[in-house]
Amino acid sequence: PPARRHVILSKVDESIEIEGTKYNLYSNICKNYISDGYKYQESFEKEYMPVFTYKVNDLKITKIICMEYGKNTVCVLYKIQNDGPKAKLTVTPIVNFRDFHTMSTNHEFKIKQDIKSSKVKLVIDEYSNYPVYFYMPNGNYIEHFNDTFRNMYYLEEEKRGFFPEENLAVPGRYEIEIEENSRKRNKLYMFFRGKY
């Protein structure tokens, strides 16, 4: 197997806002808390690639996660079918920069961002030779400062006898406006440059 593998994009959290009410589509586990986005999930497929389908009122979101073969690139495709009022989709990349076999326990991240519209260059913990890039066409990027998701809990790590909690960085979020009674596609690209 390849050596020197790293976790960079841990996950992407989404929420939808309709008529002033926010619905979180993500499900995260902390030691004494589980967020309940799973109640909006209608289906999950994994035959060729992960496909999640969510439904909130009259709005349906299909999320497809793809990776480019032989590259350090992830694409998350969102297909949105809105049969109701205007809405806003928020897409939040949650990142790390650690070896695949370690945990970022009690870690405080140092994030530097270079933002040009919806294109973002991240330098995590001063690894300037290994920048991470995000790009979401039609998304409005909002930078976060010193935003850390603390104590994400991994049940499988605990079952293996390892410490099950770690900190993750939340560098910012994308917001996408969705018109009433509309269909829309949007993509989040994340890629990594550099060699170990």
Model-flagged regions — what are they?
Residues 1-196:
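Terminal accessory carbohydrate-recognition/targeting modules of carbohydrate-active enzymes
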